[in-house]
Amino acid sequence: MKNRYLKNARIPERKVRELLNLFCEDLTATQIANISGVSRITVNAYLKLIRTQIAQYCEEHNPYYHGNRLNQIGTDANHTSENHFYGIFKSEQFIYTRNILNPDNVWLNNWVRGKINVENEILVQNDLHIYEAIADFSRAKLFRVNSGSHFTKGRSKIDEIDLFWGIMKSRIVKFRGLNSSTTYLHIKESEFRYNNRNADLFAIIHALIQKRPLHYLRQESVFF
């Protein structure tokens, strides 16, 4: 079956567009499967590829993007099961997130909880100086950065990071928690949805897929 979005696909292009449209409506895989008549296994496979496409888009638009980050997307996702810390910062009216890879978890836990102070030089070496907040997804808690080496205590005034975190927590509840293997993709999806909340999501994602078809992201473990 000819399908420009995915080679050797078993569903036609119109069905892929339907899945994408339902995805943009922020429905769950079960809801999409029930509406489209496509099996949940196939829906989940497509959603994973779509979310990976979105993650690449987010990485490319991150102010601290480095070209090799695209090759680390799978690595980021795999590290999530071991590390649940994500840095959050705002730049030019947009919210960005980054997985904090390979930190000393004991040191990081103590730092974000205000138990220890850290020299700014160490923060710069670990790329932690750029964040306005750090989210701990293992506990669904957000720690706000007050200054270079300290964290705030108590509730800060509501700003865009608070709004983004509220949306992120709502998604955690909606999906009844996040599987450790897909946490990274859901976080990037939330970042994408928040930064493009007033845009046509379907048009953006469809253009991405047309430029880079899903079969470029396909993995051996994905079934169609």
Predicted regions and their residues:
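Residue-level recognition of single "structural anchor" positions
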Residues: M1-F224
